[in-house]
Curated annotation (Swiss-Prot):
Organism domain of life: Bacteria
Function per UniProt: Is the main repressor of the genes involved in the de novo synthesis of purine nucleotides, regulating purB, purC, purEK, purF, purHD, purL, purMN and guaBA expression. PurR is allosterically activated to bind its cognate DNA by binding the purine corepressors, hypoxanthine or guanine, thereby effecting transcription repression.
Protein name: HTH-type transcriptional repressor PurR
Keyword DNA-binding on entry: yes
Domains: entry comment: Consists of two structural and functional domains: an N-terminal DNA-binding domain, approximately the first 60 residues, and a larger C-terminal domain, approximately 280 residues, which imparts the function of corepressor binding and oligomerization.
GO biological process, any: purine nucleotide biosynthetic process
Pathway listed: Purine metabolism; purine nucleotide biosynthesis [regulation]
Assembly and binders: Homodimer.
Length: 336
């Protein structure tokens, strides 16, 4: 691997001159600059990123810690973050934690050693222990995005209550009165608020919620599949079902298909998140859209602002508002 000394020797100049050409820190005569650039090209020389970062106090890199990059919703946010980082001249180090506290700690230590310019933390839920751990790395500019009510983090307000209400209202407006729900784990903020939106819409329409049609599971396709199979053991079935995320809806549709039941002819289904794949479900899924692109971009912009002003004291926590929108496709049937 070529060194700066090799470049200087080939160009017939000092290493200091090579450094000035690379970093544009001093005027260098045109012919000298061309000789240096020619030597760099011939030798395929690349300046040491570590050495440069020590000199200019930046690595142009950002660390991102997420619960998982496998879930389509998070994957689409990560894609948006990576793309926006790239356009701003930053590399992204992605770390999956799988909600393992030891992994969180190890990833934070590794990213600190790599001298990342900032940290973006995006997990589905936070414990006090995890928040305390993050605070111990407070010398690094950081954006901790939280869907919950914690006071010591930035907040993503995805208006899940409104989204749950909007989804249920659409089913009601299509004539459905027997409506079930496959919700997430109700001890978690996002699932609970979507369920509360469902409750509100049912209450407004003076419709009774059948407790047997309220099924709880994780935001995974397997849980949607298992919940639907439990629902199908009942004598009376709902005409419509609100699945509180799209991958649960996929699992639910799979279970229906195995029983030779059709969507929406035998049961209407509405999802939530509008992941990219949802338009290719069979049938294409009616769902609630959240802008993952906007969320990723805004989170990066907040972090870059903190990196720029990191020496100016404590930063105020930020809030990102994501407005839910109804996307009508083919999985809900009107029975009016």
């Amino acid at each position: 691997m070529a060194t700066i000394k090799d470049v200087a020797k080939m160009a017939g100049v000092s290493t200091t001159t090579v450094s000035h050409v690379i970093n544009k820190t001093r005027f260098v005569a045109k012919d000298t600059e061309e000789a240096v650039l020619s030597a760099i090209k011939q030798l395929n020389y690349s300046p040491s990123a570590v050495a440069r970062s020590l000199k200019v106090n930046t690595t142009k890199s950002i660390g991102m810690i997420v619960t998982t990059s496998e879930a389509p919703y998070f994957a689409e946010i990560i894609h948006s973050v990576e793309e926006h980082c790239y356009r701003q001249g930053y590399s992204l180090f992605l770390c999956n934690t799988q909600n393992d506290p030891e992994k969180v700690k190890n990833h934070l230590e590794m990213l600190a050693k790599k001298r990342v310019d900032g940290l973006l933390v995006m997990c589905s839920e936070y414990t006090q222990d995890s928040l305390d751990l993050l605070s111990s790395f407070s010398t690094i500019p950081m954006v901790v995005m939280d869907w919950g009510p914690n006071a010591n983090t930035d907040v993503i307000d995805d208006h899940s209550f409104d989204g749950g209400y909007l989804a249920t209202k659409h089913l009601i407006e299509c004539g459905h009165k027997k409506i079930g729900i496959i919700c997430g784990e109700l001890n978690k903020t996002t699932a609970r608020t979507r369920y509360e939106g469902f409750e509100k819409a049912m209450e407004e329409a003076k419709l009774t919620i059948n407790p047997s049609w309220v099924l709880e599971g994780a935001f995974e396709p397997e849980d949607g599949y298992e919940c639907m199979n439990r629902l199908l053991t009942q004598e009376e079935l709902p005409t419509a079902l609100f699945c509180c995320n799209d991958v649960m809806a996929l699992g639910a549709i799979s279970a229906l298909t195995e029983k030779c039941l059709r969507v929406p002819e035998d049961m209407s289904i509405i999802g939530y998140d509008d992941i990219h794949a949802s338009r290719f479900y069979a049938p294409p899924l009616t769902t609630i859209h959240q802008s993952k692109l906007r969320l990723g971009r805004q989170a990066v912009n907040i972090l870059l602002e903190r990196i720029t002003h990191k020496d100016e004291g404590v930063q105020q926590y930020s809030r990102i508002d994501i407005t839910p929108e109804l996307i009508i496709r083919k999985s809900v049937k009107s029975i009016l």
